From Swiss-Prot:
Organism of derivation: Gallus gallus
Region (Disordered), start-end ranges: 139-196, 436-466
Protein name per its UniProtKB record: GATA-binding factor 2
Taxonomic lineage from the root: Eukaryota, Metazoa, Chordata, Craniata, Vertebrata
Gene3D superfamilies linked to this entry: Erythroid Transcription Factor GATA-1, subunit A
UniProt keyword list: Activator, DNA-binding, Metal-binding, Nucleus, Repeat, Transcription, Transcription regulation, Zinc, Zinc-finger
Gene Ontology CC: one annotated term: nucleus
Annotated Pfam families: GATA (PF00320)
Composition bias type Low complexity, residue spans: 139-155, 174-188
PANTHER family: ENDOTHELIAL TRANSCRIPTION FACTOR GATA-2, TRANSCRIPTION FACTOR GATA FAMILY MEMBER
GO biological process: cell fate commitment; negative regulation of transcription by RNA polymerase II; positive regulation of angiogenesis; positive regulation of miRNA transcription; positive regulation of transcription by RNA polymerase II
Zinc finger intervals, GATA-type: 281-305, 335-359
InterPro entries linked to this entry: TF_GATA-2/3, Transcription_factor_GATA, Znf_GATA, Znf_NHR/GATA
Length: 466
């Protein structure tokens, strides 16, 4: 036996349990199906479908489902590999709607992974109008997507098949009351709802790409241009880290100006101070020094002892040497030429004898001893003129002192009080919510974890999440 070229070999026509010919359900698709050799008895229906479930072979009613399943299987195999989850509905003879319905499982057996959660279940109008048609999602309407079959298979699989892994629906018992026949009046509304679901899915995938960036970057970009407020399906983890990673004051309105310090405020670095506590110079016993050094054995030295040891190669003496008397008041010293005992600077002549500053300079310049007739009782000093650099530095210091006095006397416009008064009108900044998405809102909202959807979801999406 041969199967149609547009379907895999494992996808064959199911056993019609209600005694009707397949062409009565699908008049235009009779050539795509194989006529079964014989019909299965009603009591072997469960065994037949359990056998299909055990082999993992999905079963479809029309070619639209088959093409969507093949294209989705190829795309999903590249994404998930061997970790693909294949949940299925458990069928048992004890379920009343299986026993009472002559059509058993309608025209086909649904696999939740082949059905788009953003659309309704049957895609073919005849399948939707079958008397035994059963919806996987109880809250969905089978007639809402009756006109989707007008789409081409390529465009349908490209727009509806998932841009992200789907959420497997819960195992629910279909509601027989939810089935209804497709009517021309409802087809227009179904087409509009399906278009809305397509737009919602595309914008949702784009929003998830934007959310993959860092939280701070996404928050800054959302301040400039408000993106759509789509949220990921609640079964997946949030894309924003936990609240403890960032302080709540960062997104608090009062933290921008004059409010409590945010989590990014640099903390005072007291590590160096805490590490230096308890150190003591092994030479002089000092505990405070601008720079700690080490000797050859690794012991700590203060800056003074370390420099002395580095320059002289020996330890710095603990007792400071006495300061020598000034050259002018050196006891027992007199000039060998003029016999004076007071001078600003003691010098030595060629013989090594001490001479006063005047006699030493005179001998240095004229190579003769200074005559005694030039000796004076007082020491003549020169009135040196101040250089330009010293004048500028002095003027700068005086101007700084005057400016500081003026700042203390009068309230400057740069004072803290004036700055606070200027900051007060800035309180109209829009508050920010501390939820998963950071969006500027005109009115404050409570920082709760509840998800508010900006666009109405299809009923199947809401039912799957519920």
């Amino acid at each position: 036996m041969e199967v149609a070229t547009d379907q895999p070999r494992w996808m064959t026509h199911h056993a019609v349990l209600n005694g009707q010919h397949p062409e009565s359900h699908h008049p235009g698709l009779a050539h795509n199906y194989m006529e079964p050799a014989q019909l299965l008895p009603p009591d072997e229906v469960d065994v037949f479908f359990n056998h299909l479930d055990s082999q993992g072979n999905p079963y479809y009613a029309n070619s639209a489902h088959a093409r969507a399943r093949v294209s989705y299987s190829q795309a999903h195999a590249r994404l998930t590999g061997s970790q693909m989850c294949r949940p299925h509905l458990i069928h048992s003879p004890g379920i009343p709607w299986l026993d009472s319905s002559k059509a058993a499982l309608s025209a086909h057996h649904h696999n939740p992974w082949t059905v788009n959660p953003f659309t309704k279940t049957p895609l073919h109008p005849s399948a939707a109008g079958a008397p035994g048609a059963i919806s996987v999602y109880p809250g969905s309407s089978t007639s809402s997507t009756a006109s989707v079959s007008s789409l081409t298979p390529a465009s349908h699989s490209g727009s509806h098949l998932f841009g992200f892994p789907p959420t497997p629906p819960k195992e629910v018992s279909p509601d027989p009351n939810s089935t209804s026949a497709a009517s021309p009046s409802s087809s227009a509304g179904a087409r509009q709802e399906d278009k809305d679901s397509i737009k919602y899915q595309v914008s949702l995938s784009e929003g998830m790409k934007m959310e993959s960036a860092s939280p701070l970057r996404s928050s800054l970009t959302s301040m400039g241009a408000q993106p759509s407020t789509h949220h990921p399906i609640p079964t997946y983890p949030s894309y924003v880290p936990a609240a403890h990673d960032y302080s709540s004051s960062l997104f608090h309105p009062g933290s921008f100006l004059g409010g409590p310090a945010s989590s990014f405020t640099p903390k005072p670095r007291s590590k160096a101070r805490s590490c230096s506590e308890g150190r003591e110079c092994v030479n002089c016993g000092a505990t405070a020094t601008p720079l700690w050094r080490r000797d050859g054995t690794g012991h700590y030295l203060c800056n003074a002892c370390g420099l002395y040891h580095k320059m002289n190669g020996q330890n710095r003496p603990l007792i400071k040497p006495k300061r020598r008397l000034s050259a002018a008041r050196r006891a027992g010293t007199c000039c060998a030429n003029c016999q004076t005992t007071t001078t600003t600077l003691w010098r030595r002549n060629a013989n090594g004898d001490p001479v006063c500053n005047a006699c030493g300079l005179y001998y240095k310049l004229h190579n003769v001893n200074r005559p005694l007739t030039m000796k004076k009782e007082g020491i003549q000093t020169r009135n040196r003129k101040m250089s330009n650099k010293s004048k500028k530095s002095k003027k700068g210091s005086e101007c700084f002192e005057e400016l500081s006095k003026c700042m203390q006397e009068k309230s400057s416009p740069f004072s803290a009080a004036a700055l606070a008064s200027h900051m007060a009108p800035m309180g109209h900044l829009p508050p920010f919510s501390h939820s998963g998405h950071i969006l500027p809102t005109p009115t404050p909202i409570h920082p709760s974890s509840s998800i508010s959807f900006g666009h109405p979801h299809p009923s199947s999406m809401v039912t799957a999440m519920g």
